[in-house]
Structures are given as C-alpha cells and as structure tokens.
A protein has these predicted regions:
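Hydrophobic alpha-helical transmembrane segments
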Residues: 47-54, 109-116, 134-141, 157-165
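Structural signature of hydrophobic alpha-helical transmembrane segments
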Residues: 59-70, 113-128, 173
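Terminal transmembrane helical module of multi-pass membrane proteins
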Residues: 136-196
C-alpha cells in the first residue's frame, strides 16, 4: 500500500473498520478474561472473608496475594491458540494499556493496604478502579453489557464504605459478578451463537 494522506471520510472509515475488527475479535476473546478475573476475584474474596471470620485473625487478609496468581492461572488455562497472522490493532493496544494502568494501580493500592499501616478502604478503591476499567473497555468496544456492568460497579463502590464489615465483601462480590462475570458470559454466548 502506498503512503498517501487519507481524506477525512477515508480516515473515519478506517477507524470505524479498526473498531469493528477489534470488536468482533473482542466478542470472541473478551469473555475469557472477564470470566477469569471475575471468578478469581469472587473465589479469593470468599476465601479471605471466610478465613477472617472463622479464625478471627486479620492476617488471613494476606490471602489476597493469591488473587493475581489465580487470575493469571485461569487466564493461562482458558487461553486459546492465536490464529496465524492475527494483527493487534491500535484499539487492542489501547484496551491493553487501559488494563495495564488499572491493574498496576489496583496492585499498588493493595500493596499499600497490606504492607503499610495505612487504613485504606481497599474494597471501595478496587471496585472503583476495576469499574472504571470495565466501563472504558465497554465504551471502546461498544458493548453495552460491559459498559453498564462497569457503571454498576462504580455506583456500588461507595456502598462498601457505609456497609458494615459483614456486608462489604458481599457488595464487592456483587460488583464483580455484575461487572465481569455477567458480561463475560454474555460475550461468550454471543461468540458461540453469532447473529444470522
């Protein structure tokens, strides 16, 4: 293809095709990451919550450290072989960068909460950060359930601040179910049952 300046209409059409290509690939591939991280978070939350309640010892909060391990393990187990010649588009890179920033931010705040004397409302902060990342992803790929799930998590996040200790983990779990697990299953369903 020769280098030339694109006219405005050609440029918009190219951007539209890139978004649509990414969106169609996202519909096929996006369900697994949402499900892996959603289920990893829910399972870890239940484990931490149950251990802290049963043993009455806050040191069980260190179980949160298994979340990234479980999430990456589920991602690895559920991976699929990439087709030869698949190209990463600009939109793919944008979404990857969004999640790199959100993930590193969540990790940094979590480390502060676990290893410093700071008292941080960690469930609120993490639900808010992940809700923002999910909303941005849903808006970029133009997939309403993902965007709405992210907004629902953002709205739910402040309720973790006013809920008692017993209810905070349940609200956190509900946020991840609405934000990642439900949209992840919808994406998988749509990819397995394409519109005709």
């Amino acid at each position: 293809m020769e280098d030339r300046k694109l006219e405005a209409a050609e440029s918009l059409a190219l951007i539209g095709r890139m978004i649509e290509n990414t969106r169609s690939r996202m519909v096929r591939n996006s369900g697994r990451p949402l499900l892996a991280w959603g289920y990893a978070t829910v399972l870890t939350t239940f484990a931490v919550w149950g251990a802290v309640l049963y043993f009455q010892n806050p040191r069980w909060n260190y179980l949160w450290l298994m979340l990234p391990l479980l999430g990456w393990l589920l991602m690895w187990v559920s991976r699929e072989k990439k087709p030869e010649g698949e190209v990463r588009t600009f939109v793919d890179r944008v979404i990857g960068n969004v999640w790199t920033v959100m993930g590193l931010s969540a990790w940094f705040v979590s480390m502060l909460a676990l290893f410093t004397p700071m008292r941080l409302p960690i469930l609120f902060i993490i639900l808010l950060i992940m809700g923002m990342g999910t909303t941005v992803t849903g808006l970029i790929i133009r997939f309403t359930p993902t965007a709405v799930g992210g907004v629902a998590a953002i709205i739910l996040a402040p309720f973790t601040l006013i809920a008692g200790n017993m209810w905070q983990p349940l609200l956190f779990i509900a946020g991840f179910v609405v934000m990642m697990i439900v949209p992840g299953h919808i994406l998988n369903y749509k990819s397995n049952h394409p519109a005709r």
